[in-house]
Swiss-Prot record:
Sorted UniProt keywords: Oxidoreductase, Pyridoxal phosphate
GO CC terms of this entry: cytosol; glycine cleavage complex
InterPro entries: Aminotrans_V_dom, GcvPB, GDC-P_C, GDC_P, PyrdxlP-dep_Trfase, PyrdxlP-dep_Trfase_major, PyrdxlP-dep_Trfase_small
Cofactor(s) listed in the protein's UniProt record: pyridoxal 5'-phosphate
Family: Belongs to the GcvP family. C-terminal subunit subfamily.
Organism: Treponema denticola (strain ATCC 35405 / DSM 14222 / CIP 103919 / JCM 8153 / KCTC 15104)
Protein's gene: gcvPB
Protein name per Swiss-Prot or TrEMBL: Probable glycine dehydrogenase (decarboxylating) subunit 2
Keyword Flavoprotein: no
Subunit structure: The glycine cleavage system is composed of four proteins: P, T, L and H. In this organism, the P 'protein' is a heterodimer of two subunits.
GO molecular function: glycine binding; glycine dehydrogenase (decarboxylating) activity; pyridoxal phosphate binding
Gene3D superfamilies with a match to the protein in the record: 6.20.440.10, Aspartate Aminotransferase, domain 1 (3.90.1150.10), Type I PLP-dependent aspartate aminotransferase-like (Major domain) (3.40.640.10)
Residue numbers carrying N6-(pyridoxal phosphate)lysine: 264
Reactions catalysed according to its record: N(6)-[(R)-lipoyl]-L-lysyl-[glycine-cleavage complex H protein] + glycine + H(+) = N(6)-[(R)-S(8)-aminomethyldihydrolipoyl]-L-lysyl-[glycine-cleavage complex H protein] + CO2
């Protein structure tokens, strides 16, 4: 492992300093540090070489296949980056007077309208900064709706056992009790269990469709009817919208409120903590509760509306991650309605193609046509060879393939979840299948080798348990460096 940038520091090494072009201003001494900050002192060349070296160790969509299930790691067109980098957008400050940023407001308003068309929702808020933030915001809206109606007993959120872990976490954050709904033998929500569970205390059911097993909830209309009849609302986790966009709308399935991941479905770069964007959309009867300000208007005449007495208030400063909005807006405008429909079709086609190639050698968790992703179970392989899903996933790294999602959903033992996305070629999928088949053969012929992968990368097998339990999140200088 190479040295940290702090360890490469040499006193006196520095960049060429730009000349001051404005009058010098001296801060009052009470605002100054008592001692110099321990920042690394390196030259520009040392700086560039250090981060170039680190970049070679980073795997992203631009340099390799990234089939991380439930994450939609599709290619991000560089045109979107050009739009987000236009000076007329980047030089605007959110505290400017509204009349001086009409173009930005129009972009937000039109994006919200287009997201509404795609999802079948009547109104949108772009404020939430990530998927889980969108979940949390949507649940605040649901809570406000029930409270305004005096329905204070509705404090239970129903969550399928295959759901993303953020669903129950978000429900807990708004003070609700989480009730687990099991899956049936086909990987769908168990309808009979749902009927037994709903009642006067049901606030909402949080449901991804396709679900996190990559399967379409075929009884969705019946599910919506059951929840609504009990007085609850149906919430759409938009993590898997990439499988149906342009073909089927959550609003038409009976959903009342949705969150989307612009950083997944609408092709804006993600990973490494952000930036993300998790807008929420809702039906007309929930619009009054959306965070302020709401962008209102149409056809180029948009404005920011703060006059919303029943709004849940702001959920973040300013208006959200604006440059992420622009990337998603450019993506939608570039593809158009037909392109969006094609994208979801190819996403489903690619997933089914790869699944078909692998199911001859691996057990598929649910033997059905999948949507945009599928889940393998390596339980039998582990029982017979001792090789785990983790070992197979790490083996992919040496062939330049990012591991799929491991051990999720939790209801599938030794799970590997693949999501190829629509932007990958047949040759990439064929190569991935070849590597997976090779690794299975090694599991039976040389299991010890599998336990050691990866071998050819700068960093080998990491102790992930230790990293999770004893994280080192900042640089600590040795005693001799103090």
């Amino acid at each position: 492992m190479s040295e940290l940038i702090f360890e490469k520091s040499v006193k006196g090494h520095k960049f060429a300093e730009a000349k001051l072009t404005v009058p010098e201003y001296k801060l009052d001494s009470k605002y100054l540090r008592a001692s110099d900050a321990k920042l690394p002192e390196v030259s520009e060349l040392e700086f560039v070489r250090h981060y170039m070296e680190l970049s070679k160790r980073t795997h992203g969509v631009d340099n390799g296949f990234y089939p991380l299930g439930s994450c939609t790691m599709k290619y991000n067109p560089k045109l979107n980056e050009e739009v987000a980098d236009l000076p007329n957008f980047t030089n605007i400050h959110p505290l400017q007077p509204e009349h001086t940023m009409k173009g930005c407001i129009e972009a937000m308003g039109d994006l919200g309208k287009k997201l509404g068309e795609i999802t079948g929702m009547d109104a949108f808020s772009l404020q939430p900064s990530a998927g889980a933030h969108g979940e949390f915001t949507a649940l605040l809206v649901i809570r406000a709706y029930h409270e305004k109606r005096g329905d204070h007993a509705r404090n239970k959120i129903l969550v399928p056992d295959s759901a993303h872990g953020t669903n129950p976490a978000s429900a807990a954050m708004v003070g609700c009790e989480i009730v687990n709904i099991p899956s049936d033998k086909d990987g769908n929500v168990d309808i009979e269990e749902l009927k037994k569970t709903v009642g006067n205390d049901t606030a909402a059911l949080m449901l991804t469709n396709p679900n996190t097993l990559g399967l379409f909830e075929t009884h969705i209309k019946e599910i919506a009817e059951i929840v609504h009849k009990a007085g609850g609302l149906l919430y759409y986790d938009g993590a898997n919208l990439n499988a149906i966009m342009g073909r089927l709308r959550p609003g038409d399935m009976g959903y009342d409120i949705v969150h989307l991941n612009l950083h997944k479905t609408f092709s804006t770069p993600h990973g490494g903590g952000g930036p993300g964007s998790g807008p929420i959309g809702c039906k007309k009867f929930l619009e009054e509760f959306l965070p302020v300000p709401v962008v209102t208007g149409s056809d180029g005449s948009y404005k920011l509306d703060y006059n919303r007495p029943d709004s849940i208030g702001r959920v973040r400063n300013f208006y959200g991650n604006f440059l992420v909005f622009l990337r998603a807006y450019a993506y939608i405008l570039t593809l158009g309605s037909e392109g969006i429909r094609e994208s979801s079709g190819y996403a489903v086609l690619n997933a089914n193609y790869l699944k078909k190639k692998l199911e001859k050698e691996y057990d598929v968790a649910f033997d059905r046509i999948c949507m945009h992703e599928f889940v393998l179970t390596l339980e039998k392989i582990k029982e017979e060879t001792g090789v785990s899903a983790l070992d197979i996933a790490k083996g992919l790294i040496d062939d330049g393939i990012h591991p799929p999602t491991m051990y999720f959903p939790l209801i599938v033992h030794e799970a590997l979840m693949f999501e190829p996305t629509e932007t990958e070629s047949k040759s990439t999928l064929d190569f991935t299948a070849e590597v997976m088949i090779k690794l299975k053969k090694e599991a039976y012929s040389n299991p010890e080798k599998l336990h050691g992968y990866p071998y050819t990368r700068p960093i080998g097998r990491v102790d992930e348990t230790k990293a999770a339990r004893e994280p080192v999140l900042r640089y600590k200088a040795c005693c001799c460096c103090k």
